[in-house]
Design a protein with these regions (language model features):
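Solvent-exposed alpha-helices and their adjacent loops that cap or buttress functional pockets
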Residues: 16-17, 62-66, 111
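Short, small-residue-biased leader/transition segments that mark boundaries at the very start
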Residues: 1-8
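Short loop segments at secondary-structure junctions
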Residues: 14, 77-79, 124
């Protein structure tokens, strides 16, 4: 079964984004995301790969208690000005489960196989 995705479109006007700049794209809708879910705004692959545009914060997060208009902050990674046309699909929204946790401050942690090994500590193959 093909999964449906919500494509986010600019609704108002054409917007030109200069190289190295960010513009907030107003899409003209607000959502009531159910409690326990979060909305994640991702780049559309064509916008990023072909035109150099991607969400400025890499992944936009829409909490379930947010009720305002959804906007996408698009950053121009290319070396030239790029125009986003009115109605153009600019991003995609994915709903995902969201788990909250209560953390407790501790003086020590349980040992693990990995331990304190950070970046690159698990090998490359």
């Amino acid at each position: 079964r093909r999964q449906r995705q919500m494509c986010i479109r600019d609704r108002d006007k054409d917007i030109t984004i200069n190289p190295g700049c960010t513009e907030f794209i107003h899409i003209g809708i607000a959502l009531e995301i159910p409690t326990g879910l979060v909305g994640l705004i991702y780049a559309r692959s064509g916008m990023a790969c072909k035109r150099g545009l991607a969400p400025a914060n890499k992944v936009g997060v829409i909490d379930s208690d947010y009720r305002g208009e959804i906007m996408v902050a698009l950053y121009n990674h290319s070396g030239e000005a790029v125009t986003v046309s009115k109605g153009e699909r600019i991003a995609q929204l994915v709903l995902a489960p969201f788990i909250t946790a209560d953390f407790t401050e501790a003086d020590s942690l349980e040992d693990s196989v990995r331990g304190e090994g950070g970046f690159g500590s698990t090998g490359t193959h």
